[in-house]
Amino acid sequence: MEQQHIVGVHGIKQGRTSRRELIKDWNKALNRGITALHGQDVVRSDPRLIPTLEIPHWSSLLARGADRLGPSDFFPDDSTALTADEEAFIVEAMDDLLTPQERALAEELDPTTLGLPKLPPSVTRRAMVYDRRTPDSVVGKLITCLREVRFYLKHPNLASKVQEHVVKAFSDDTATVVIGHSLGSVIAYDLIRQEQIAAPGTAVHTFVTCGSPLGIPAVRRAMNIPGPELLAMPAHVKWLNVYDPDDVVTGAAGLALGARNVTDVEVDNGNIDPHAVQAYLRTLPVARAATRSLS
């Protein structure tokens, strides 16, 4: 039995880190979960249980509003106002997540009572309603993620640079688990859908999505996936979706309603940051996927 290999596709807010730091942080979290699953003595006696890991640092490639590569701030941030197109996309996505009653309430609220900076009234009203579900005021993370997902999907030249960079991390002769977190799950799914990775006969055998926004219908529409069409994996790839219902980026739900052959697993990442990649990586479902071929 061979040691498992993982390619991680990271998510948002990684512009100021590095590939080396990402690998260090992911390894630490993965090892914690694997040790919790198998026991410290077993892990010490069989080092093959600790997978090898590669993480292409794609976010270093993107600079906002430019068709160029560079290490500068890459996606829209809290200091930049929403464009009209961003506003429309975020409103569409949040309307997907809100109930009809919540959408009606949003139209009645006074947006001046919520101090969210640089947000237009249409977004602020919906944020106020969504905030009632999540009293810890984490709706800002959802808005940030939606901006970055849209930026990736609506700038094909930049997206192709990201895809080219990520694809280089894969080998057709190394058994591989792909772990995509947040926007990284969208990037990885795009690559699988286009058969740039995980095509028949290649070594990718498992796809793990963590904190994925793929369950939000507006995201799928932006990926040019028609409403009735279900997300899907090639027959030879096992798909595991790990989500925390308190993670707003997931829409507080799994993917089973919008995807075929996916296994949803609910986890509890705690209250500090349910969307944090380290919290997902140290869960037992991810540890099982990371060591499946050895069990």
Where are these regions (language model features)?
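Lipid deacylating catalytic domains
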Residues: 1-59, 63-70, 111-179, 185-295
